[in-house]
């Protein structure tokens, strides 16, 4: 880590211990106790403070009140940065900058605060809203906790706001939306959560840094209205598609989507981004082939799409983009590439094609692994993320409706295919995206963004159940998820505090392009305006290995860059995780319970005969399998069959199911299953099993399986909340 710091900050090297969760909670509570009603300050608050000192003007008095309140809110100041914060001469305080007021050149006011890298622990008092002349607020690489006070809305002259690499929590700080002149917003490396407001992208901003937080939901369609040159979404939990409006971002130079739960096909509109230098969509769940429009990315220098589920051919023209320096498409399922795309064919371009399905190339996936994905290509013309109707899936579900129930008992074998899951190596890659989402609905309805809506309804309806198997297969995909420790990622970056120089805000947009290729930029990266400010490279430390690949991001995205490229390779090991699914056969019984339901759902279908009984299994997931089994017995006949049902799929048990010829009746009794479903929370699961058993494993799953991976609908990341202890 020492190499991350510049001279002025060299003394920081691991010298001060980080805050414990208990301390963070304590500081947050201190802030809550001091916040006024609604977090707003009365206009006459300064008159409520009895001061025996005189000030050059009223504004400096207000600044004094604010800074003294802030000093009292400091919990730890290892370098005594605020040691001289006493007396009326606030312009002499360390980290405080004064300048002539914009509305009156004869009046000196506090125009900026720069405490970058001071390693101060504490919270932000509401009184800071008194410094209404502040245009620059830089706090990156400290240990501030709590929330951004609502009183910050009064800082209407704010131009640069950098609170990166701290421990702030709560929803996106909406106060930034009230600043008419703000150009630079950096909230990286914190614990902000929830949705990002669509209004953020409607502001006239130069740079937006959201990476390494806990944001969820989809990326707003308003993204295309942004005037920003740099936008980073990396290392969060965004799901869904890349908005097609992205093609309208005329000023965009760098955009990072790395390590989220995004999926579907790439929208062809990306090809309109003729000014983009860095595009990183690695470690997600994108599917389909690369749009031909990508040939329009004529300014592209760093292009990373590794760690996804992309298939097809890497076109020659993409590998010959005029300014291309680095193209990484490892950990996908490409089965062909142009001659210019072969690593080593172009000395001036770094190419990485490992862990694909390319013939005659080293370090590729096994034939079995590739077959699972390549045999089920995704039709992007029908994918909603690419602008298609995405109705193919629903149509399929109706067709299988009642006819296939009996025929598909054998399909259960397909479940192993999910085991192959195409995303094995990438899985380790990705860290958090998939896991959180899958738990909520193993049904996988949301995952199949394109077809999920249709598939889910069918599942519940009598015929649709057939598609349910697809969800099961999807489950393996989530398993692949590299979703292992995005959060851990976040904290390591702290080092890059060299931001004090940031004051020069004008440099915002320029930094990005220049810094791209050279990893060194990270130090310069901090506040966009001043390359130095961007040093917040806290991210670099975290993702130190990848820095080379994403060095471009450093320009404005220094921290993210490191986070971006190398990671994919690191996680190659995870693929094994999916191999287990094949064994699913033996564990079918457990599947019924809950974890495996997605993968094991196929087995239940096999037991179509005892579907009635099987419907109860849904309850088993809840851990009350017996009860459900008993209740259904009357309608279905013999509860025991259910127990046998798990095994039947593959072995002797099948006879029992056969004995329960009732299955045919089952179709008539479908009504009963519904009843069963009503008791259990998983009603959908119950009704489908009866009929779907046979249908479930159908070809539909295979075709859909691959599409579902996108996880487009998952927004239920429950994990994030737990992370906020004490709030």
From Swiss-Prot:
Glycans are attached at residues 80, 326. Residues 1-22 form the signal peptide. Residues 381-727 are annotated as: Disordered. It holds the Pfam family LRR_1. GO terms for cellular component: extracellular region. PANTHER family: LEUCINE-RICH REPEAT EXTENSIN-LIKE PROTEIN 3-RELATED, POLLEN-SPECIFIC LEUCINE-RICH REPEAT EXTENSIN-LIKE PROTEIN 3. This is Pollen-specific leucine-rich repeat extensin-like protein 3. The gene is PEX3.
